Amino acid sequence: MKITKLEKKKRLYLMELDNGDKCYITEDTIVRFMLSRDKVISEEELKEIQDFAQFSYGKNLALYHLSFKARTEKEVREYLKKYDIDKNIVSQVIANLKEDKWINDGQYAYAIINTNQLSGDKGPYVLTQKLAQKGISKSTIEENLKEFDFSEVAQRVANKLLKKYEGKLPARALQDKIIQNLTNKGFSYSDAKIAFDDLDSQVDQETTQELIFKELDKQYTKYARKYEGYELKQRLTQVLARKGYDFSDIASALREYL
């Protein structure tokens, strides 16, 4: 077979043969096989050219995808699937990129965890979930998590939460709110509790009294329409307890309020 045409088409070249066959190849393919117009190639050589062209095309696509930011193996595989590249060729591309250090799931996991350590707010459980969604193996995630102490991150998040809620919630509700937020962000209950205990949190009696009377004003308007006397007192006690106020503070406030 003889090559009758080699014509550039955007990123690829169109190669035509004298038997009517056509295929798109990359510039790397032309260089590797020293292709030119009128060159004679065999069926076997054509197959090699087509396979390498797909590999070269897939690698170029992957490198373009990786040029914007680091990606995991799973992310690159999914990207290449969109271009209908043969699965075997995709595996070859991935292996080549891993060999050349373009893809390294271990380094990717370390970088994500390290960035979180410096300025993030996630605990190990949420990070594990996020990295697993990226296709990183459980063993790789665990190996990298061992390199970090999350107590500083938990403390940083706890301090921010304290600034947000202090003066707005009674002591017990403040503790519950901060610990719940920390566990939602992926910290264990024990780490969340330690972070809270290390806070300089002081909800004084005056603040508690101010908060409870403010809440009573709101709840009294709601319940006084339906209840009175003992039943009203019970309803107010229940709703204030659910909001984190101690029963002794509730009883004291109700004596003054009612």
From Swiss-Prot:
Protein name per Swiss-Prot or TrEMBL: Regulatory protein RecX
Keyword Nucleus: no
The keyword Iron appears for this protein: no
Entry similarity comment: Belongs to the RecX family.
InterPro entries: RecX_HTH_1st (IPR053926), RecX_HTH_2nd (IPR053924), RecX_HTH_3rd (IPR053925), Regulatory_RecX (IPR003783), WH-like_DNA-bd_sf (IPR036388)
Gene3D superfamilies: Winged helix-like DNA-binding domain superfamily/Winged helix DNA-binding domain
UniProt-listed GO biological process terms: regulation of DNA repair
GO CC annotations on file: cytoplasm
Keywords per UniProt: Cytoplasm
Entry's localization field: Cytoplasm
Role of this protein: Modulates RecA activity.
Species the sequence originates in: Streptococcus pneumoniae (strain ATCC BAA-255 / R6)
Signal peptide: none
